[in-house]
A protein has these predicted regions:
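Acidic donor-binding loop of glycosyltransferase active sites
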Residues: 200-214, 227
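A short, active-site helix/loop in glycosyltransferases that binds the activated sugar's phosphate group
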Residues: 77-100
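Short beta-strand->alpha-helix junction loop in the catalytic core
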Residues: 86, 103-113, 156-159
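Conserved donor-binding/catalytic core segment of Leloir-type glycosyltransferases
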Residues: 115-132, 137-140, 151
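A charged, aromatic-enriched C-terminal amphipathic alpha-helix characteristic of glycosyltransferases
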Residues: 12-16, 252, 256, 273-294
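Nucleotide-activated donor-binding/catalytic signature segment of Leloir-type glycosyltransferases, i.e.
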Residues: 164-193
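Short hydrophobic beta-strand element within catalytic cores of glycosyltransferases
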Residues: 228-231, 238
Length: 294
């Protein structure tokens, strides 16, 4: 049977979900199904098949625009959203029919727990730079804490060479700043398997997100690996990380956001090894690994 074609040069969250779906579902599941990832394009419709659009994008992306066209939506049999939040936003923005919509949350492969280093606190930021890296770096520098390091796994090459050629230059200065900042380890792009190995050693996923995440696989993986998540409540982050995450209110005034985030991060660092927090993280690991599973 024909299978949907994966985007070979992109290793973003959506594409990795796609690859895992192909891994876990047998070939016969795709019989008569045309599965379209993240692109509401007339050209991708196959009229003799069941057309399923798997939507990880937010409503502000150009690939979502055709969901406002009745002509296009009529050609779809199903629209699968990766969170209730994303579904609600599409209903609000495009009036997509609820009868054709379904929410299936993202999934990860089980992450085995390893005891974490008690002599230092390791923070990690392992998502694209435009989601809040500038603000995190500023907060981290200002906190200037002993025995705390920040590990940055962020790049534009994750979405392929073409994307990197167009967008990469814009983020060169922030990546250079990471390389030249005390107690910051800059890894650039790491394949997902290496990220998971690193997460097992990390204590806190520091994610002052200014981007409306529609799910946030990096947060799911972090929680499964026993990391505290300190993030904003923007987009679907609250849905994905509740009740375990530590949230600050998103604020368009970035000075306010940084102040608030700095307090929350400092508190989480200070209290990481408290009995109460360790009990919470144990429950978090078990819950996330079982609820976000394939």
């Amino acid at each position: 049977h024909s299978r949907p074609v994966s985007f070979k040069d992109s290793c973003g969250g959506s594409e990795n979900q796609f690859r895992l779906l192909l891994k876990y579902l047998p070939d016969e599941s795709f019989k008569d199904v045309n599965l379209i990832l993240n692109n509401a394009s007339h050209d991708l419709i196959e009229k003799d098949k069941i057309n399923v659009l798997w939507m990880h994008h937010f409503v502000n992306q150009k690939e979502a625009e055709n969901l406002g066209s009745k002509d296009f939506v009529d050609k779809l049999d199903w629209i699968v959203f990766n969170s209730n939040w994303n579904f609600e936003k599409h209903v609000y923005q495009f009036k997509v029919p609820e009868t054709k919509s379904i929410v299936i949350r993202n999934a990860i492969e089980k992450i085995n727990f390893e005891e974490k280093n008690k002599n230092k606190i390791s923070l990690i930021y392992h998502t694209t730079p435009w989601r809040g890296l500038v603000h995190l770096l500023k907060v981290f520098k200002n906190l200037n804490l002993e025995n705390v390091e920040l590990n940055v796994c962020s790049s534009t090459i994750i979405y392929g060479k073409k994307f990197d050629d167009i967008v990469g230059k814009k983020y060169k200065s922030i990546f250079d700043e990471c390389k030249n900042t005390k107690n910051v380890n800059y890894y650039g792009y790491l394949e997902n398997k290496k990220i998971i190995d690193l997460l097992k050693k990390m204590h806190i996923f520091a994610h002052p997100s200014i981007w409306p995440e529609t799910s946030c696989i990096s947060a799911i993986e972090s929680m499964a690996a026993g990391c505290e998540v300190v993030s904003t409540n923007l987009g679907a982050l609250y849905e994905t990380c509740s009740p375990f995450g530590t949230f600050v209110n998103f604020d368009r005034n970035f000075d306010n956001l940084e102040k608030r985030y700095s307090k929350a991060l400092a508190y989480s660092i200070k209290n990481f090894w408290s009995d109460e927090n360790q009990n919470k993280l144990k429950l978090q690991r078990e819950t996330i690994n079982s609820t976000y599973s394939w």
